[in-house]
Amino acid sequence: FGNKGKVYDGWETRRRRSPGHDHAIVRLGAPGVVRGVVVDTAFFRGNYPPQVSVEATSIEGYPSPDDMADAVWQTIVAETPAEGDTANRYAVASDRRWTHVRLSIYPDGGVARFRVHGDVVPDPRHLEGTVDVAALENGGAVVDCSDRFYSSPVNLILPGRARSMG
């Protein structure tokens, strides 16, 4: 326990007694087309948000909180029910390139993890010199392979150096 009560591995907001809802804005690790999101409420059995929604925007650089407040947000997951202690999966039907997403929880509650899945679409203006065009971080994707017995072929295009054989 901490000075505010039980400590959770996730984001939990205090009980909301006034109208409204809570939200968190996430800058994507790489800009891209969002194909789906996961709002994972693992271990939040009674204090999970009963409803969630996700919006997205595209803003260059590192905008301030005021810039984010003034941004034009588009709903990519409409307000929809969520379950507790569950990886709530939602498909996204959008072909636009996004840089930030905003998870809203109604009215409050706890979320263990928020995952945003999609295709990386880098801004070519920010690429200099020789670029690894096969790299996952630059939009590369493994589309097929003959064998996945020991590991995923996606490992071939992950960033950084290999850490081990296992």
Predicted regions and their residues:
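Predominantly extracellular/luminal cell-surface or secreted proteins
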Residues: 40, 55-59, 117
